[in-house]
């Protein structure tokens, strides 16, 4: 069946079947589900509030000249994530009788977009929610936006003299920056800056924990971790601060064991180790007061609630309970004041709030049609036809026939290889080579259709799924919109956002617009395991096929690059209205071709002028007519004003 053929509806297929197939009810809860129309719907306030039909929303945004690919940010989801985080800690503090409070910060590196950071600061004001900065530019953002004197500004990363002095002086602006010492050589600069300015800093230290972590971010802990002080370094830092009369300004202990903690047991071990270090620091004379447990509050990308790389074996409430209970258990026997608990939970806050919607431009499929037999055909072609006839005569679904089907597929592969060898030697023509490929595809399709259900299938026949898979050409750049899928093999939920009341009859993967073989999406979630093919629908003429990438609101936008000069996509901020509708709060236009050219130091006007002059010469030579030149220049000028992606 060709990918362009009209689909034959399976009347028994339901929306619930699609939701189960794509795991929507697991990773999507409580924000995403499927409605009776077979569309993905969004509940921006989770279990409360109204729903938005995602397909209808996209169509209305397209009518506003916001073409795909389109990044849709739901501000209500961002606020809801913040509320759920604080509610979880408030419940845990109440449950365990913790004589302290929780005060979070958002790591700006997760998503530096202005509207995102501004909204988090404003929405978090009631909890004195702050920001974490890891560079001078991020520090500038944090200092300018957070004007709450009780909110924390955690200053991480490498720090030169100017960074340190900026943080110290900002205290006089009514800000509360915490300079976290992460490298031994920062101590001397901090002491010198404090003495020269005559101002006391608010200090923290980051400890290198020995707790063993798992997954991609396991290098965040241990002796070879990029950041943090070893125990000897911690002791040396305390002594240096004591000698400089700055030990009274050491108020915070920070640790970080990875951006995504999959296993709650790892967190418990880290908390026990960090809490003991905290206790020891108080014994050494530091007043302390804050324990920053870092990031790592994970996202269940595949919905399996397991310790796999794309999941977490705990809930948000489990996480808060373990942080509160473990710190209380470790600190209370020593009679010290329980610390204010801080977390840098950027991934858990930002992942859910944005959806990338892109369209499919076309498909590439294995030729499966059976070509008509010609009078004289090479032996390799004849052998393939005989193999196909044998498969067609096999009893469908018979377990006893599996070995015959396996033999037939091995024969088909061998005969195809014979045909390719004959072509290289000039014994068969190009049309005959094409015939061999078509017959091999027909064999694969026929064998796949004869395999029995619910039986163990040999590995060689399992590979038929990949052989028959289609390539769906996506109107996006993964290097711009989902770089982690390429860089660290991150899994994000992908699924059609419509036609969920139809059974998907194709298996496929996605290829992006870039001229790069790595520009593909070929790893998908599936029942707690990774699969290389996704169930998709046939394309229909004159009808867009729209795919959603979910849970990608953290890191992807800020880490994307200009590979092949594909720039940022159009983006919108959506907010629910009291009447149950929505309003577009902000529109962020995607990069135009002119903008990405300028980013690479090209002058668009100069490029146009060169082409105009070349066109004039072509007119003089009689190679172009004036009307053709006008059309060419119109196209070029329009392209400079358009986004870098293909237009429908």
Curated annotation (Swiss-Prot):
Keyword Transferase in annotation: no
NCBIfam families in UniProt: PRK05354.1 (NF003763), speA (TIGR01273)
Purpose: Catalyzes the biosynthesis of agmatine from arginine.
Modified residues (N6-(pyridoxal phosphate)lysine): 109
Superkingdom of origin: Bacteria
A biological-process GO annotation: arginine catabolic process
Name listed for the protein in its UniProt record: Biosynthetic arginine decarboxylase
Required cofactor(s): Mg(2+); pyridoxal 5'-phosphate
Family: Belongs to the Orn/Lys/Arg decarboxylase class-II family. SpeA subfamily.
Record field: catalytic activity: L-arginine + H(+) = agmatine + CO2
Binding site for substrate: 291-301
GO molecular function: arginine decarboxylase activity; metal ion binding
EC number(s) reported in the record: 4.1.1.19
Main enzyme class: lyase
PROSITE patterns registered for this protein in UniProt: ODR_DC_2_1 (PS00878), ODR_DC_2_2 (PS00879)
CDD domains, per database record: PLPDE_III_ADC
UniProt keyword annotations, A-Z: Decarboxylase, Lyase, Magnesium, Metal-binding, Polyamine biosynthesis, Pyridoxal phosphate, Spermidine biosynthesis
């Amino acid at each position: 069946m060709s990918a362009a053929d009209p689909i034959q509806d399976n009347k028994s297929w339901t929306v619930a079947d699609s939701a189960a197939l794509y795991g929507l009810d697991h990773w999507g809860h409580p924000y995403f589900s499927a409605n009776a129309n077979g569309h993905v719907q969004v509940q921006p306030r989770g279990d409360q509030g109204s729903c938005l039909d995602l397909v209808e929303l996209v169509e209305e945004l397209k009518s506003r000249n916001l073409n795909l690919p389109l990044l849709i940010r739901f501000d209500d989801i961002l606020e809801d994530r913040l509320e759920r985080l604080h509610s979880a800690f408030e419940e845990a503090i109440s449950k365990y009788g913790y004589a302290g409070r929780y005060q979070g910060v958002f790591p700006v590196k997760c998503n530096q977009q202005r509207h995102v950071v501004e909204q988090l600061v404003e929405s978090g004001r009631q909890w004195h929610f702050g920001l974490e900065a890891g560079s001078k530019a991020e520090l500038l953002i944090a200092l300018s936006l957070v004007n709450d004197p009780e909110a924390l500004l955690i200053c991480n990363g490498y720090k030169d003299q100017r960074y340190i002095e900026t943080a110290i002086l900002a205290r006089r602006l009514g800000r509360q920056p915490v300079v976290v010492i992460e490298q031994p050589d920062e101590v001397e600069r901090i002491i010198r800056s404090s003495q020269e300015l005559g101002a006391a800093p608010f200090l923290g230290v980051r400890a290198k924990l020995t707790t063993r972590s798992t997954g991609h971010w396991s290098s965040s802990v241990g002796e070879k971790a990029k950041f943090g002080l070893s125990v000897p370094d911690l002791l040396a830092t305390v002594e240096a601060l004591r000698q400089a009369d700055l030990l009274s300004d050491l108020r915070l202990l920070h640790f970080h064991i990875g951006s995504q903690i999959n296993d709650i047991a790892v967190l418990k071990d880290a908390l026990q180790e960090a809490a003991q270090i905290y206790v020891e620091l108080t014994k050494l004379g530091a007043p302390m007061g804050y324990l920053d447990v870092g990031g790592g509050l994970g996202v269940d990308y595949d919905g399996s609630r397991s310790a796999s790389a794309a999941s977490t074996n705990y809930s948000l409430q489990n996480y808060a309970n373990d942080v509160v209970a473990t710190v209380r258990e470790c600190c209370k026997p020593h009679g010290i004041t329980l610390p204010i608990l801080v977390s840098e939970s950027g991934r858990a806050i930002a992942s859910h709030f944005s959806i990338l919607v892109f369209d499919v431009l076309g498909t590439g499929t294995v030729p499966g049609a059976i070509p008509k037999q010609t009078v004289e055909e090479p032996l390799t072609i004849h052998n393939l036809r005989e193999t196909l006839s044998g498969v067609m005569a096999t009893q469908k679904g018979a377990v006893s026939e599996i070995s015959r089907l396996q033999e037939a597929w091995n024969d088909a592969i061998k005969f195809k290889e014979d045909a390719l060898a004959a072509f290289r030697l000039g014994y068969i023509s190009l049309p005959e080579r094409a015939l061999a490929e078509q017959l091999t595809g027909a064999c694969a399709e026929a064998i796949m259709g004869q395999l029995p259900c619910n039986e163990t299938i040999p590995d060689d026949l399992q590979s038929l799924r990949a052989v028959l898979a289609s390539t769906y050409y996506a109107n996006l750049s993964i290097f711009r919109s989902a770089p982690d899928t390429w860089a660290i093999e991150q899994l994000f939920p992908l699924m059609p956002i419509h036609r969920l009341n139809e059974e998907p009859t194709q298996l496929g993967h996605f290829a992006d617009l870039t001229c790069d073989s790595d520009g593909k999406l070929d790893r998908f979630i599936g029942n707690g395991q990774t699969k290389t093919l996704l169930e998709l629908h046939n394309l229909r003429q004159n009808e867009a096929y729209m795919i959603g990438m979910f849970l990608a609101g953290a890191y992807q936008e800020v880490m994307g690059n200009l590979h092949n000069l594909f720039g940022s996509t159009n983006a919108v901020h959506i907010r629910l209205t009291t009447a149950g509708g929505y309003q577009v709060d902000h529109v962020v236009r995607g990069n135009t071709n002119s903008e990405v050219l300028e980013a690479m130091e090209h002058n668009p006007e100069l490029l146009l002028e060169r082409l105009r002059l070349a066109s004039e010469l072509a007119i003089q030579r009689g190679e172009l007519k004036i009307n053709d030149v006008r059309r060419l220049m119109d196209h070029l000028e329009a392209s400079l004003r358009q986004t870098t992606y293909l237009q429908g």
